[in-house]
């Protein structure tokens, strides 16, 4: 698991672009979800989760290929599409 503290990190920039642009989501073939419940359901149903970004370590098992990133709350607030971030968001391959 890695830790990112900069809002200017390339991954954080990528996530902000996913949150703000449908054209970018189509171009990359990725979607962005902001919810612990959605992450649990995606993992349960075998969705291709690519990156999990959270303010606390995710307590449930994820496939080894999933990139797990810890960020401070202020970075989460800057990348989350939600007005009140739930503390975890993830990218996955768009269906």
Locate the predicted segments by residue.
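Arg/Lys-rich RNA-binding interfaces used to dock onto structured RNA substrates
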Residues: 1-95
């Amino acid at each position: 698991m890695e830790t990112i503290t900069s809002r200017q990190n390339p991954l954080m920039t990528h996530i902000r672009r996913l949150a703000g642009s449908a054209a970018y989501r189509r171009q990359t073939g990725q979607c962005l979800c902001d919810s612990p419940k959605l992450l649990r359901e995606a993992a349960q149903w075998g969705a291709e989760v690519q990156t999990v970004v959270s303010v606390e370590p995710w307590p449930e098992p994820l496939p080894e290929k999933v990139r797990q990133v810890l960020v401070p709350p202020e970075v989460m607030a800057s990348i989350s599409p939600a007005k009140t971030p739930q503390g975890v968001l993830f990218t996955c391959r768009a269906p």
